[in-house]
Amino acid sequence: MILWNTGNEVSEQYHPELGIARHLTEVVHRYDKTRPVTFGASYPSKSAMNGTELQVDVHGMNYAAGVYGGPDFYGEFLNKEGHEHLSGFSSESSSTMSSRGEYFPRKFHVSSYDLNEPGWGGLPDQEFAALDRYPAICGEFVWTGFDYLGEPTPFNSDKTVLLNHAAAVSKEELKKQEEELKKIEQNRPTSRSSYFGIVDLAGFPKDRYYLYQARWRPDYPMVHILPHWNWEDKNGKNVPVFVYSSGDEVELFLNDRSLGKKFKQPYEYRFRWDSVCYESGELKAIAYKDGKKWAEKHVRTTGKSVKLKLTPDKTVLKSDGEDLIFVRVSILDADGNEVPTAEPLITSSVSGPGMIAATDNGDPTCLIPFHEPKRPAFNGLYLAIVKARRGSEGTLHLCVEADGLGKEEIDIRIQNEGLEKRYLLTD
């Protein structure tokens, strides 16, 4: 824990004379003098300049690099008279939207090329550039790490829906989509979750996860290619290719033919090949850093789905009634490649002293309840969450099956270490 936060999007940011922020800061300091106090201001162009920023130790600014400030707002904040002792950070940034594995998206999905933002948000690149220009700003908290239930912008069908999608889509097309959305909502909602996460609701990383990995871990050799390379309907057509890497240059190959090198320029954070004529086969990206090979990645056109693969995050489960094992289920072709477009109906079951706690697939439009063991994979992935019966021991047997793909099974050892006593903490 590094900061105490006393609020977010608080009304007092417009009225610093009310004194509530100062009072809350003093209360926190009374009990903890070791950690600074902050809050998240949703309108930093006002709150960071009107005295509210002086009521906390560290000023949190939401979307300050975008519409609520601007590309040089952090500089204005840092250089304002009286701010010499202040520090600040981006308490909410970006809010870019995407659906995992969707690039030319189906209805009510958002493209994973990571170029769609709400009108009040921005792209990750925008925040990265502002932080690079003003390194005295401490960093950022991206909205959000995970998708979450509710708030399915841009498909929330409210009065601001036409403002919620700042992509290259005309207002006429959005209006048509809104009218269609109203018809569909007579029978069911369109989405259950947000699209903001860099990780989907099932815990599977989206492409954007790797953009942040490249940014936040420059010492970690990595390269990530998007999109997948299964595009039978796009032979001879343009399919843009993006690469995220912690390297400073990348060379892209299609079926061993070089498509050229790209160099990371100041305030640029993606390597882009916007005009790639699709042909099946293999994409390969080789990243370099300081002139030396840094990382390599391959993406291949896959064959048909033939089997399932189960990957648990661990193999021993405590029987304390709370411990969980998350089993990633992927679909493979005959060569062992994951098929990124496969969406078979998958069923999970257990025998032994345990249960299926939940299943998921990361699809924001899937309304199947979490406790149901049967659901389709979404863009090649399915999740089973397994739990042991309280106080049990022995072995739990998990079976996952899909029509035409057979079944896969794993054994999970249950460890009974005795139930921990739990106490209420009091003064």
Which positions does each model-derived feature cover?
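Short S/T/G/P-enriched beta-strand
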Residues: 214-240, 251, 300-326, 332-339, ...
